[in-house]
């Protein structure tokens, strides 16, 4: 596994940003095999979003995402969003624009990462789950699947506290995506029944699950989990097994790590 840290100036943000790129590579179990000398193709990729109060390191430190990515032969990209909910903010901090275009421009040009939307996925936890839903549903042809782990979903009440951070209404965005008639990304959501966001996520699920069309939808309601990395470490593995893939690395089967 290659883990690459990048610090680059962002034209969307107006200052440098930290990015971590995980690239599958060979292990002691497949040392000196042909594909370790010449890649059979570009890697599929998951853009993995952190939650409120975290940064690009959270998924790397508190889950085994690096090992899971190696096993599934898939690249992972993380970056720091500074509690801005993956939205454009005042004073030029355009995190929506950064994730929507600049980040993929960089990694797809500098690394062996696929630019094929069918090999591009987006997922996140908490605030990052909100970001994954927002970006996946406002760019219907950009991602093959969305993973929303205990997502921060504000109520439709405009005075609700979460709306101060997550300013774009996910209910409105989702209704517009459904009304577009376009193919929707596959959607994976999960929540623990002890999570403080449980009622919000359950309400969103019950509102839109029956209306999801032409795509797969999975909802995991797990007992005895709160808002914690224990559930996210568990469910990211399920998500990696669940997403639809036709790339050459999927055909090679799981890697032994």
Which ranges hold each PLM region?
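Non-catalytic cap/lid and distal C-terminal segments of serine-dependent acyl enzymes
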Residues: 1-257
């Amino acid at each position: 596994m290659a883990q690459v840290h990048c610090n680059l100036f962002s034209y969307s943000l107006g200052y440098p940003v930290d990015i971590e790129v995980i690239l599958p590579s060979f292990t002691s179990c497949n040392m000196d095999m042909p594909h370790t000398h010449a890649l059979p193709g570009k890697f599929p990729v998951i853009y993995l979003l952190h939650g409120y109060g975290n940064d690009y390191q959270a998924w790397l430190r508190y889950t085994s995402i690096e090992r899971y990515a190696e096993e599934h032969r898939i690249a992972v990209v993380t970056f720091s969003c500074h509690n801005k909910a993956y939205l454009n903010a005042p004073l030029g901090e355009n995190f929506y624009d950064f994730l929507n275009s600049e980040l993929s421009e960089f990694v797809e040009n500098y690394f062996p990462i696929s630019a094929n939307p069918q090999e591009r996925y987006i997922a996140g936890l908490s605030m990052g789950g909100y970001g994954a839903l927002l970006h996946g549903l406002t760019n219907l042809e950009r991602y093959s699947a969305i993973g929303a782990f205990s997502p921060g979903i504000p109520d439709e009440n405009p005075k609700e506290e979460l709306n101060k951070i997550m300013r774009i209404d996910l209910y409105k965005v989702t209704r517009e995506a459904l009304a577009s008639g376009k193919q929707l990304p596959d959607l994976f959501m999960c929540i623990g029944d002890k999570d403080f966001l449980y009622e919000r996520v359950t309400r969103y699920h019950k509102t839109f699950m029956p209306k999801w069309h032409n795509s797969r939808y999975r909802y995991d309601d797990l007992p005895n989990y709160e808002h914690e990395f224990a559930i996210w470490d568990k469910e990211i593995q399920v998500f990696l097994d669940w997403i639809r893939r036709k790339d050459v690395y999927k055909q090679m089967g799981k890697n032994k790590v």
